[in-house]
Amino acid sequence: MEYLPLFANLRQRTVLVVGGGNVAARKIQLLMRTGAHIKVVADDLCPELARIVNKKDINWIGKLFEPAMLDEVFLVIAATNNTKLNALVYKCAEKRHIFANIVDKQSYCSFIFPSIVDRSPIVVAISSSGKAPVLARILREKIETILPMFIGPMATLVGTWRNRIKQHIHNIAWRRRFWETILNGRFAHLISQGKWEHAEKEIESQLYHYQSPIGNVALVGAGPGDSGLLTLRGLQLMQQADIVLYDYLVSPEILDLVRRDADRIYVGKQAGKHSMPQAEINSLLVKLALQGKNVVRLKGGDPFIFGRGGEELQAVAAAGISFQVVPGITAASGATAYAGIPLTHREYAHSVIFITGHQCDDSSNYLNWSLLARSNQTLVIYMGVIQAAVIKKKLLAHGRALQTPVAVISRGTLKDQSVIIGTLEQLEMLTIQALSPTLLIIGEVVKISCEINWFGKIIKEQ
């Protein structure tokens, strides 16, 4: 983030604009909507600025800029075609720690103007950090078509009820949930129909019948990593959460989509490294929900595929707590799709089997290796890097060919995705450089990746 979006209260604050042309006029017209006390410094004014000055809406200083003019100024804008003057304004402002914007000279800007959608008091600001102003304008136009004109008056009406709601509902999280119910329900529908009195009565009715909320748990699959693969329902619940418990496999891009004010607890589950035992996670989910909170349990991939989501919900259900499940795209589906490897194919694989490397211990008889070694199927192994030698040994012993195609996919669907292709004979070598998380794909379908890979590069070992 190159620029932090801030909303400045300019009411009754002094803003100095250096320049009297059309560009300065456009900036001043925007500033006038904020209630700022505006001074313009210029030896001459364009017709529009002259009209504004004549109406006594702004103060005109008809002389050359002097550094002393920045005294008692909150921020300054320079919009002249004199590069030396613009530079002087910026340097003087910097020396006084005053925000400055030099039009069309980004290196001389301590703040920049965004594209604005004004539905006051709702204001949306869009910025490209000065890189693509036309793109920012196009985005603004799209948002203009989405936001109804009544959204501003609706926000004003809601504001008149805030103190009363605070007095009635003291818990911040419960109060937020009350407003979510109001704004997503009949109230908003009545506003859209222009029935303002009925809408206000709806708030009053909801408040009169208000009861303390009951907590719940949402088990949400975050998908394999790419934030674009998160489900819409998962995003909605993450935006409504009071608290989120998340794992190691949840990408930073996904976490950025969680509601800003939601508490976050890392319960990192990584092969051999559990920051919190499973029993404690189960207990924590129950404890938080019993406090009346909206709890989101966020897991990488799909929570019901090697995610122990079932165990967690058994504990929640046993406590009588309401819950729901939002499936996610499991790593086997997401990572192989991004690597151009179809899990099934009419010519090469009629079935697919998912297992984890934890089950592949050399001394374990848990797995049916004869079944896993069959041809015409795809074998996907989660967390299999540590057991690569055992996997190779077992599959070869039960009939899989040395030249069976193998893919090692690390950090699937992410920008730094790595796909290394070789054969079963090379499996241990292929996994040496693998970054976590890693999937092993074993089967003839791997050959197709060279034809339909579309994301990132594939390294083919000889």
UniProtKB/Swiss-Prot annotation:
Keywords attached to this entry: Cobalamin biosynthesis, Lyase, Methyltransferase, Multifunctional enzyme, NAD, Oxidoreductase, Phosphoprotein, Porphyrin biosynthesis, S-adenosyl-L-methionine, Transferase
Residues bound to NAD(+): N22, V23, D43, D44
Residue ranges of the region described as Uroporphyrinogen-III C-methyltransferase: 215-462
Pathway the protein takes part in: Cofactor biosynthesis; adenosylcobalamin biosynthesis; precorrin-2 from uroporphyrinogen III: step 1/1; Cofactor biosynthesis; adenosylcobalamin biosynthesis; sirohydrochlorin from precorrin-2: step 1/1; Porphyrin-containing compound metabolism; siroheme biosynthesis; precorrin-2 from uroporphyrinogen III: step 1/1; Porphyrin-containing compound metabolism; siroheme biosynthesis; siroheme from sirohydrochlorin: step 1/1
GO MF entries: NAD binding; precorrin-2 dehydrogenase activity; sirohydrochlorin ferrochelatase activity; uroporphyrin-III C-methyltransferase activity
Chain positions with Phosphoserine modification: S128
Family note: In the N-terminal section; belongs to the precorrin-2 dehydrogenase / sirohydrochlorin ferrochelatase family. In the C-terminal section; belongs to the precorrin methyltransferase family.
Name of this protein: Siroheme synthase
Organism: Baumannia cicadellinicola subsp. Homalodisca coagulata
